[in-house]
Amino acid sequence: MLIFEFCAENLTFIDKAIAAGAGRIELCDNLAVGGTTPSLGVIQEAIKLTEEKSVDLCVIIRPRGGDFVYTDLEVQAMLADIRAAKEIGVSSFVLGALTSDRKLDQRVMQLLLAACGEAEVVFHMAFDELAHTDQLEAI
């Protein structure tokens, strides 16, 4: 089944995207830097909009723009964002983490995936930063 996904910056255009046939909304903030984690208030309102239209919602977990190599402090912030988002009803996340040599950061990904629990997880554009030979292994 083909799913049309719309990447929404905050609440802007979610209604129009759904009306145009989007089957899933990827919610983020700061698209100019590739997307960052939106506020809890924005997430709550997006949940209301998507639930009433029976459209899936995925929330990006990314503490900042730039690369996908995160400090321990940033990882802790990501874990806190996942926990908080789950508490208000998020069941699908978009995330990813790499090492400084552009490999999948296994340690960080294990922490993030464990925090997500049973939630659906989509690996974001960090995947494109992996060497082609590493992409298959990462899957």
Located regions from the model:
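Active-site-adjacent beta->alpha loops and helix N-cap segments on the catalytic face
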Residues: 11-16, 31-56, 72-76, 97-117, ...
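Short, flexible N-terminal segments of the mature chain
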Residues: 21-22, 29-32
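Hydrophobic alpha-helical segments and helix pairs
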Residues: 81, 90-94
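Hydrophobic faces of well-ordered beta-strands that scaffold small-molecule active sites
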Residues: 2-8, 25-27, 55-61, 93-95, ...
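Surface-exposed binding patches on compact interaction domains or structured appendages
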Residues: 67-68
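Active-site beta-alpha loop architecture of Rossmann-like, nucleotide-cofactor-dependent enzymes
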Residues: 64, 128
